[in-house]
């Protein structure tokens, strides 16, 4: 490895399922000698993800140990004949005594001409595989927690309840440690998840919150591995495994030929887009110029957006970066154009349907048992009382808008989803998927709604109906998959908006209207 070139190092990274690191290693011109000279701090600067850091350092450490443990051969004459065996680590050449005894009883290890029998080498490789598997099984029964950072250890010693960021740090270190023990594998078994979480809760029982801590920590650990696995979804070996074992239960398995056919279609779409650039270039230039004007010709905008719909859908389906899409078609930032695109694609007036949902389900959601003590509901009650005392709530339309705003903000709470993936109230956006930002939600004149995409403000809207319709439209128009922790809320909305099936509204049987005076 010391004599490897940069290309050889990159090839080795791909073989070790670390192909994501190749561009960075090429940029820094990391050769074999440089790779072996890396220390922990250098690896942290070179590799972003903590899981990849752990795997890379473990591979380097094992190589150095194996290199030091290699024993010199008897003489120069034997060097050429023993080269294949010397290339392997010592434990591969010298398995356990029992295994070695079995091998010598089957085949002579060394022939008369001092050459190693290839059948023996094959048996030794098989023994290595069995030993590695046995080692993994042993690990699952006696897992030892890693050495946590100083601040995490202080929190554990003081038995403080960890906040969200501290939970993430603990999970990251557990995931990195498991990956190291699993020799780079990102697919632990259920038993291995159980053993790790059990070890954590046995060492620190206060983390088991109300007896439900085991399932919460296990789910968080599983989600962390899913997040780490995302960058390798397009890896050739991963695609082969999906093809072999099936990606989802009940899903039709795709052959490798089908996968390659899909890849060819994507390439064809991109090539077709390139050829059509000359035809749509005039439209794109016009869009960019018209978007900068204060008074726009909306009839012409609608006409040209319809003419470029096909190429736009192909580009979005071909995974063209959203920044490029929005640069070429800036009017997609306008809620009206997003609603129009949804109407063309689904034959649905999304604004009208969204308004109907907020009006129809407002009372049910605001009186649902799961949100009675929610801070948003409490803030609504206080503002309504304040405005009533001042005589501001004379218009029924103002009261109706306040209730619909609260309904919009409470949707993920009612369905048990993650609210920060849906709306951020008086805070900062931290997610890349479409999300709403709301400032001063119940202020009659100072309430502000904005739609964010990739942590950047896409557009500012006037009211909660437009905001919610724009949020649902953004996922549809830009082909973005809904986050799993928001699936229940979006299933409810899309079911009603696109008339897919009758939705199941949770917690209506649990609501206790008598525990809170009705909103009038």
From Swiss-Prot:
**Coiled coil (UniProt feature):** none
Q: What ranges does the record give for the region Disordered, renumbered to this chain?
A: 67-104
Give the superkingdom in one word.
Eukaryota
Q: Which residues cross the membrane?
A: none
What InterPro entries does this protein's entry cite? SAM, SAM/pointed_sf, SAMD3, SAMD3_SAM
PROSITE patterns documented for this protein: SAM_DOMAIN
Q: What is this protein called?
A: Sterile alpha motif domain-containing protein 3
Gene name tied to this protein: Samd3
Q: Where is the composition biased (Polar residues)?
A: 94-104
Chain ranges of the SAM domain: 4-71
Alphabetical list of SUPFAM superfamilies matching this protein: SAM/Pointed domain
Please name the Pfam families in this protein's record.
SAM_1 (PF00536)
- The organism encoding this protein is Mus musculus (Mouse)
**UniProt xrefs under Gene3D superfamilies:** Transcription Factor, Ets-1
């Amino acid at each position: 490895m010391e004599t490897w070139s940069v290309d050889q190092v990159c090839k080795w990274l791909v073989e070790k399922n670390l192909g994501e690191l190749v561009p960075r290693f090429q940029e820094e011109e990391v050769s074999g000698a440089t790779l072996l000279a890396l220390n922990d701090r250098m690896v942290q600067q070179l590799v972003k993800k903590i899981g990849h850091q752990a795997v890379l350092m473990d591979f380097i450490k094992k190589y150095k140990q194996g290199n030091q443990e290699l024993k010199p051969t008897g003489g120069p004459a034997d060097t050429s004949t023993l080269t294949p065996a010397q290339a392997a680590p010592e434990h591969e050449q010298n398995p356990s005594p029992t295994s070695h005894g079995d091998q010598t009883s089957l085949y002579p290890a060394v022939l008369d001409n001092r050459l190693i029998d290839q059948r023996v080498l094959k048996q030794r490789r098989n023994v290595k595989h069995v030993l590695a598997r046995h080692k993994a099984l042993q690990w699952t029964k006696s897992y030892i927690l890693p050495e946590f950072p100083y601040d995490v250890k202080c929190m554990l010693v003081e038995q403080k309840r960890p906040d969200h960021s501290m939970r993430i740090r603990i999970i990251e270190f557990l995931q990195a440690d498991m990956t190291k023990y699993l020799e780079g594998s990102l697919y632990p078994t259920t038993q291995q998840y159980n053993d790790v979480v059990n070890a954590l809760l046995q060492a620190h029982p206060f983390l088991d919150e109300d007896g439900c801590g085991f399932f919460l920590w296990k789910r968080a650990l599983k989600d962390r591995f899913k997040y780490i696995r995302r960058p390798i979804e397009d890896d050739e070996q991963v695609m082969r495994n999906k093809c072999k074992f099936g990606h989802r239960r009940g899903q039709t398995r795709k052959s490798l030929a089908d996968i390659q056919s899909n890849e060819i279609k994507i390439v064809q779409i991109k090539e077709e887009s390139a050829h059509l650039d000359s035809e749509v270039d005039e439209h794109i230039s016009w869009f960019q110029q018209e978007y900068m004007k204060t008074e726009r010709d909306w009839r012409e905008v609608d006409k040209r957006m319809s003419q470029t719909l096909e190429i736009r859908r192909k580009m979005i389906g071909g995974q063209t970066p959203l920044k490029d899409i929005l640069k070429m078609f800036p009017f997609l930032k306008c809620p009206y154009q997003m609603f129009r695109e949804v109407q063309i694609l689904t034959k649905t007036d999304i604004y009208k349907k969204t308004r109907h949902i907020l009006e129809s389900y407002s009372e049910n959601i605001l009186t649902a048992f799961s949100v009675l003590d929610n801070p948003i509901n409490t803030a609504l009650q206080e503002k309504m009382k304040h405005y009533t005392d001042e005589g501001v709530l004379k218009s029924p339309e103002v009261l109706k808008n306040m209730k619909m705003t609260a309904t919009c903000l409470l949707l993920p709470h009612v369905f048990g989803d993650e609210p920060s993936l849906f709306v951020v109230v008086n805070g900062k956006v931290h997610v890349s998927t479409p999300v709403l930002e709301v400032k001063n939600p119940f202020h009659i004149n100072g309430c502000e709604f904005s739609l964010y995409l990739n942590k950047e403000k896409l557009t500012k809207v006037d009211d909660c109906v437009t905001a919610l319709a724009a949020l649902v439209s953004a996922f549809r128009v830009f082909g973005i998959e809904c986050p799993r922790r928001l699936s229940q809320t979006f299933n409810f909305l899309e079911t009603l908006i696109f008339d897919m099936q009758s939705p199941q509204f949770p917690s209506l049987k649990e609501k206790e209207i008598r525990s809170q005076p009705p909103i009038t």
